[in-house]
Amino acid sequence: VDVEVLKSNELEQYKPLNLYGWSKHKFELHARDEGLLSRIVGLKYFNVYGPNEEHKGDMRSVVSKAFAQIQENDGMTLFRSHVPEYQDGEQQRDFLYVKDAVRMTLHLAENIDAGGLYNLGCGKARTWLDLAHAIFATLDKDPDITFVDMPESIRDKYQYHTEADISKIRQTGYSDNLFDLEDA
């Protein structure tokens, strides 16, 4: 268990950009400060997607929303990049197929020695363009992507890159192959 690393100031360095991230961060700090990390398993799921999400409405995954948008409109709208490090559509996310999320969760639930905080993702950042092209190919449609300005209200909070470090769950013996966007 990687508890000793978390006892250091490592957790102090993070600056969450939204309330959800802040609540996760505060829980992690509390668990660390109370000496609970070796007795709990905390899971941080990265962009989970999969079938049958329609009932979640606006809370469904971005993958589900993009699929519906392309299916209904034959095109997809993406935010322009507002930083020089990323071109339009090159913003990145770690997309995790729901079947992988379930397998990872069950693995940790069944592993009596697991303890601490785990990132659950595929461990590989993919671009919004990768996502768009995978969906267009699945629907057998020619790509039609429109870029629009990102609303001012979210520009300073927008994450241009997320990628789960899944080395910790791999160290517990989890060795399953993970779905790629193109295969899920």
Language-model features: locations:
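A generic local structural motif
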Residues: 7, 28-29, 63-64, 105, ...
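Hydrophobic alpha-helix immediately C-terminal to the catalytic Tyr-X-X-X-Lys motif of short-chain
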Residues: 26-30, 34, 62-66, 131, ...
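Catalytic helix-loop patch of NAD(P)-dependent Rossmann-fold dehydrogenases
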Residues: 1-49, 53-54, 58
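Generic alpha-helical secondary structure signal
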Residues: 61, 65, 161-164
